[in-house]
């Protein structure tokens, strides 16, 4: 349908992560999206619920209540693995599209930080991220835990930066 017809795709703002994610999905699939930018995801979700737009690109946490109530349906996730909260929903990769885009969070320190301090911080935060309280919080808020060491996280940032730069260029946006 989306390859033959334009789909109005709401997102959280021009150049925002979910605008870029939808652009990546369109690029990979050949779908035609009319990007409808909002000031945050809430307006896009409200307009989707009111059937004023056809779809949204947002994090699952932002729509979980509507999915659980049956008001919205998730077609695919842009993560590299399925989400525990919606295990029957495939990833884009499983659907045949190389789209792994989204948000992440991490801890950074100055480059001059001694290695032993970096290792201690990694261990402290790694242990905390595996604690029952944190895992429970992340599960309840429908977020994914992906613990990476410094070099792995740096690789992820660099790879994502390359992807997002290409999407920004494709969209004709200026990096500021």
Mark where each language-model region is:
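An extracytoplasmic/periplasmic, membrane-proximal ligand-sensing/linker region
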Residues: 27-31, 68, 113-176
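Residue-level signature of catalytic and energy-coupling elements of molecular machines
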Residues: 48, 92, 164
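Hinge/capping helix and adjacent helix->loop/strand transition within the periplasmic-binding protein
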Residues: 1-43, 92, 97, 104-137
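Ligand-binding pocket segment of bilobal, Venus flytrap-like solute-binding proteins
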Residues: 8-89
């Amino acid at each position: 349908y989306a390859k033959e017809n334009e789909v109005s795709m709401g997102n959280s703002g021009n150049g925002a992560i979910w605008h870029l994610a939808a652009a990546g999905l369109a690029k990979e699939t050949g779908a035609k999206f009319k990007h409808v930018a909002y000031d945050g995801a809430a307006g896009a979700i409200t307009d989707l619920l009111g059937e004023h737009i056809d779809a949204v690109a947002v994090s699952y946490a932002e729509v979980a209540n509507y999915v659980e109530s049956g008001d919205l349906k998730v077609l695919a996730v842009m993560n590299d693995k399925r989400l525990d909260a919606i295990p029957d929903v495939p990833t884009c990769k499983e659907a045949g599209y190389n789209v792994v885009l989204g948000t992440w969070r991490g801890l950074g320190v100055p480059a001059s930080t001694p290695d032993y301090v970096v290792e201690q911080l990694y261990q402290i935060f790694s242990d905390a991220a595996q604690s029952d309280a944190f895992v429970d919080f992340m599960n309840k808020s429908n977020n994914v835990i992906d613990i990476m060491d410094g070099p792995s996280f740096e690789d992820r940032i660099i790879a994502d930066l390359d992807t997002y730069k290409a999407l920004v260029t494709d969209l004709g946006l200026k990096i500021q």
